[in-house]
Amino acid sequence: MLPSWTIGLLLLATVRGKEICYQPFGCFSDETPWARTCHWPFKLFPWAPKDIDTHFLLYTNENPNNFQLINITNLDTIEASNFQLDRKTRFIIHGFIDKGEDSWPSEMCKKMFKVEKVNCICVDWRRGALTRYTQAVHNTRVVGAEIAFLIQGLSTKFDYNPENVHLIGHSLGAHTAAEAGRRLGGHVGRLTGLDPAQPCFQNTPEEVRLDPSDAMFVDVIHTDSAPFIPFLGFGMSQKVGHLDFYPNGGKEMPGCQKNTLSTIVDVDGIWEGIEDFAACNHLRSYKYYSSSIFSPDGFLGYPCASYDEFQEEENKCFPCPAEGCPKMGHYADQFQGKTSAVGQTFFLNTGDSGNFTRWRYRVSVTLAGKRNVHGYIRIALYGSNANSKQYNIFKGSLQPNARYTHDIDVDLNVGKVQKVKFLWYNHIIDLFHPELGASQVMVQSGEDKTEHKFCGSDTVRENILQTLNPC
């Protein structure tokens, strides 16, 4: 519940349409372009910093489990902490009805410590986020100003380069990061938007929302981009970065179509279960990012005009072009062409659980046999690292000497493909006991374009495996 003086201030702002100032963070207007962005009948001011009560929780490799509280108006707390000036600093900013302490941001920090030396600051603005959505939208402006104030202080007092800062924001946190980046003139090194919030931000002016000018490099993961009305998509669909990733098309994530009960029981804790059911697609963005820290190669994004084109048989978006494909998530900034243009779109498919990783291959099967058969053909890859399960390549009329091609997303990194196993079946009783085989199987890796050719000389009855070796 808001303090009475704050309610009075908001009512006054509604009538007078002026600005409110919170020193040392500057002034905040309720006029265009911030007014009525949500079709809300009242103009709103952001709450005062003391009411939002933002906490900056510093975790480092030296204190991965217990944070050190940073006071942004007293940078002696930086000197007294484990903050290291020779390391990158990653800020992780939660979104609406969320928190930064004892939640996914601190868990993400712990994963980072396994792969790098880094300062990891969780921005906990839960009091400003646990209110009605439209008010939380405006509160992001103050939180963004506070983040910018801290980064500017690090630069001024310690000569810390803003290019070494990476802002990571989920939902409303993405636009909070954008506000911070904008206040710093876009000089922050990197900004990652994890399914930036759609309501109040979609198709608004750039100064209101996340856009590519907010940092030197902006990468975005879209996972819940269906229209808010009528589909209740919480994330933006429009391109707002240098690299915009749309896993699974950016709207419906695998594993998010379960029934209410199974979703709630599947996860740790009843509250997390309810939250996961209500916003499963929206939350996938930070889960994908977190998983990418350990498994970067399993989140390769392919440049493509649309998801439909990406899913087409023998699509033109496969394999990766000469300049390569970016890795969605933690290592997206390693992509050579990351800032060559804004609004570059990339597509990929993910798994429905676990670490969500997938490796894409194009498989072409040439059949051998004596007669046409109606049924299914499947292929398993056997590699230097692991062996895959059987993947469907085609169903329908199977014709000897015909070639069937399909792109598959393998759920583990098999390494170098050393052999393949072919299987066909039709589940129909056939008194003639037909036989089919694969005379040739071509397997191409999406990442490095390498092709492997396998040959066979046999035919087999249905549900009998045929092994093909290199030729």
Curated annotation (Swiss-Prot):
Transmembrane regions listed in the UniProt entry: none
Subcellular location: Secreted; Zymogen granule membrane; Cell projection, Neuron projection
Any one GO molecular function term: phospholipase A1 activity
The keyword Hydrolase appears for this protein: yes
Pathway field: Glycerolipid metabolism; triacylglycerol degradation; Glycolipid metabolism
Region ranges (Required for galactolipase activity): 93-105, 257-279
Residues of the active site: S171, D195, H282
EC code: 3.1.1.26, 3.1.1.3
Highest taxon, organism lineage: Eukaryota
PANTHER family: LIPASE, PANCREATIC LIPASE-RELATED PROTEIN 2
Known function: Lipase that primarily hydrolyzes triglycerides and galactosylglycerides. In neonates, may play a major role in pancreatic digestion of dietary fats such as milk fat globules enriched in long-chain triglycerides. Hydrolyzes short-, medium- and long-chain fatty acyls in triglycerides without apparent positional specificity. Can completely deacylate triacylglycerols. When the liver matures and bile salt synthesis increases, likely functions mainly as a galactolipase and monoacylglycerol lipase.
UniProt name for this protein: Pancreatic lipase-related protein 2
Origin organism lineage: Eukaryota, Metazoa, Chordata, Craniata, Vertebrata
